[in-house]
Amino acid sequence: MDITQLLAFSTKNKASDLHLSAGLPPMIRVHGDVRRINVEALDHKQVHAMIYDIMNDAQRKHYEEFLEVDFSFELEGLARFRVNAFNQNRGAAAAFRTIPSRILTLEQLNCPRIFADLALKPRGLVLVTGPTGSGKSTTLAAMVNHLNENQYGHVLTIEDPIEFVHESKKCLVNQREVGRMTLSFANALRSALREDPDAVLVGEMRDLETIRLAMTAAETGHLVFGTLHTSSAAKTIDRIIDVFPSEEKEMVRAMLSESLVAVISQTLCKNKEGSGRVAAHEIMLGTPAVRNLIRENKVAQMYSAIQMGNGFGMQTLDQSLSELVKSNQITNAEARGKAKIPENFPG
């Protein structure tokens, strides 16, 4: 099997990921579970050749120098893939994340209605968080698409690598890939403020400078979408504040309390039939009460504020899981395994 056949097989079987690892057969992740493909094990030379076939010269050079590389790759008529090539103890390896060629709408993703409102906010910081593979990119792509279909403006995305490709509909959409079209997230964000954007998507807010620039952009009248690998709203606020030195923390709390629009923390659950996955969301909005908690460093009280903020559109993860159980989308056992307080789902 060549790489094209493996990726076609992976896509046909609705896999989210394909794994190549020297010394083992190829494997796919379907509905969260990793399964072996029933073919012979691949050796180092085979995996290395498969990876090199789809890299350009710059990517090969980066791989040789740093022993790993991120890039995106498209099989026309099939899908795009986000690729990380690396080395492991048996030899070459790579992980391919499938990026559907069609951007799903917020309705198709069964997102809460408030997501559509958040996508059309005139300014502020909207964060979508969760572990790797929790569907953050898919949710953000749907939000950007909703903006693109409903308002006129300029949307700038900064990604590593570019995942979903957006057509310019009502919005002009410019997508920039770190490493190919800009040197870093921070460089691109610094330039973004001079490029007349209405909305900026930051693929990953992973360092102090990027986080600072994203908050500045939100504070100066832009809508900024960003992602972090945190599992709850409270942990997201802590993570942002903790990046900064102690003498800046108070100022950062004040900035964040002014600019934060929402934190959406999501996790994927297996559906009841075992034929797919659905997202559960914790939603924290920048209400006056939440802004006050951020300013006064009372992060521990945020969970209660979210619990009591139903009227504003807020919900805890457990409240979201409970709705999914009630609507017969997931089992009680699946909810218990994902819940913040498992005792909420006895049985």
Each model region followed by its residue ranges:
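Short, flexible helix-loop junctions that flank or precede catalytic/ligand sites
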Residues: 1-347
